[in-house]
């Protein structure tokens, strides 16, 4: 296993013909300065795809995406949601195009939060141009919201966390359900602290997330109308490959996915990742 990998040997051998392949694209929080740089330098397909996204999206961003992803730009620039979402999308598209060039095909696509936009592109629902427009608008409109929102991970079930929210009366939303005991809450800082303090009092582990805004919460609502106008103007096509929905946590109805209102709900409602997996 790992010893073989460390020695440069073959860790796994053989051919598997059964089973189907799912491809998952990650969401915000996984970005890091320099991500994809070695792949860019080594593989022309990756470089061409990354450059194409940057060329399409730079005009809609407050700076060069390549500069921010490669060098970080100003301190913390890549962690600003306007750049984080665009940077992840650019790297994920380039990764997928590289895999495709090697003959990899997917039977299902899924994505965590903004990663589902990459899934939509990979499934043939949007042209690259329209996908770039969506990602840029999503990040730009979220970035323009007032600061002060926070998110926290809680090691408890969704039902238990919802009960705490109800008991405290806090204006907090469940933003993601990532596992049986892995829930993220989102809202204004003082409201989330009420929930977190109660959770800690019950012996549950909690962790503050490094985010600029309270994503997938009621604090996103002021940007929804502007986002709705953007997604309504895109050319949507039914997916050529099935997509698992963040909103429902189930295989998405192809006609639902091409309804612009789905992508508005996608911003506001929790990521049902555990159900989707």
Give the location of each predicted region.
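Short, surface-exposed "cap/lid" segments of acyl-processing enzymes
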Residues: 17-48, 52
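Acyltransferase
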Residues: 70-277
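Conserved alpha/beta-domain cores
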Residues: 11-14
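N-terminal structural subdomain of ketosynthase/condensing enzymes
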Residues: 51-77
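Helix-enriched interaction subdomains in cytosolic or periplasmic regions
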Residues: 1-6
